[in-house]
Regions:
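Extracellular and organelle-lumenal recognition/adhesion modules and their flexible linkers in secreted
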Residues: 83-233
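Short, charged, solvent-exposed linker or helix-capping segments at domain edges/interfaces
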Residues: 11-13, 73-80, 138-139, 187-188
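Solvent-exposed beta-edge/loop recognition patches
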Residues: 1-74
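Tryptophan-centered motif/residue detector
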Residues: 21, 51-53, 79, 90, ...
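Short intrinsically disordered coil segments
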Residues: 15-16, 47-49, 62, 78-85, ...
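Generic structural hydrophobic/aromatic packing signal, biased to beta-strands
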Residues: 1, 45, 79, 95, ...
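Low-complexity, flexible helical/coil segments
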Residues: 2-3, 35, 69-71, 80-85, ...
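Short C-terminal domain-edge/linker segments immediately following a structured domain
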Residues: 30, 65-66, 75-77, 94-98, ...
Length: 233
């Protein structure tokens, strides 16, 4: 059963498709039953989103996949979150917004990013440029992580993030972002102080760009200038 039958058959042409799934599964817990044509039960499983169940398959990106067809699928250990590292490539993201203040605190001069749920992604070439079409000014340092994690702070449930060698390019360094839960406005994120203690100007345009590669779990990255300026997911 698949929600998008065309996409499924294109990706898995050798697999047998029984029909289209038009329902909706809960992100918390659901009981799924498989019945034969005569309505006799063939299999049944109830999944959860916590405890021993994979945290990366919680409705934010990765799917829940059975690791062994011959194992007892009632056990959480027989399930895993899908690994997207071999199916996703590097993509460049870029957006522009004014540095308009929302009335929040302005004493910190930081750039902040984090995932909206548990997950892992690779990041590189993170840039914040003020007035990109005019007198462009780069607001960040160590944007390509060639100096390791210098200048970057991994906080709270993003603390396991680290700089690693790019799996696809041994001569390149990237940030392996590892999140155990949702980012927050004061904690649970990755942050860096703006170069030279620069301030964000409410009337100026800022271009925020980066390269990213999704690995597993949530693929929703939130970026912003502190407090909540030029924010986007």
């Amino acid at each position: 059963m698949a929600r998008d039958t065309t996409l499924f058959t294109t990706a898995y042409p050798a697999s047998r498709l029984l029909g289209e799934f038009s329902g909706r599964l809960s992100r918390r817990s659901e009981r799924i039953s498989l019945l034969a044509a005569d309505r006799n039960p063939v299999d049944e499983v109830r999944y959860f989103d916590a405890g021993r169940w994979p945290q990366h398959a919680d409705g934010g990106g990765s799917s829940l996949e059975l690791r062994d067809l011959d194992a007892d699928n009632q056990l959480p250990e027989t399930w895993a979150a899908s690994d997207e590292s071999h199916q996703s490539g590097w993509r460049t993201y870029s957006y522009r917004k004014r540095g308009t203040s929302n009335g929040g605190p302005n004493e910190w001069r930081d750039f902040v990013l984090g995932l909206l749920d548990a997950g892992e992604i690779l990041l590189d070439d993170i840039r914040v440029v003020e007035s990109p079409d005019g007198n462009a000014v780069q607001f960040l340092t160590n944007t390509s992580f060639e100096s390791g994690a210098t200048g970057w702070r991994m906080v709270g449930n993003h603390r396991l993030s680290r700089v690693i060698t790019d799996p696809d390019n041994p001569g390149n360094k990237v940030l392996h972002l590892v999140s155990e839960g949702a980012t927050e406005h004061m904690h649970n994120h990755i942050e860096t102080t703006l170069a030279g203690g620069r301030s964000v100007n409410s009337s100026r345009v800022y271009e925020i760009s980066f390269r990213a590669r999704w690995l597993t779990g949530s693929n929703q990255l939130h970026t912003r200038l502190y407090f909540n300026r030029a924010a986007q997911t």
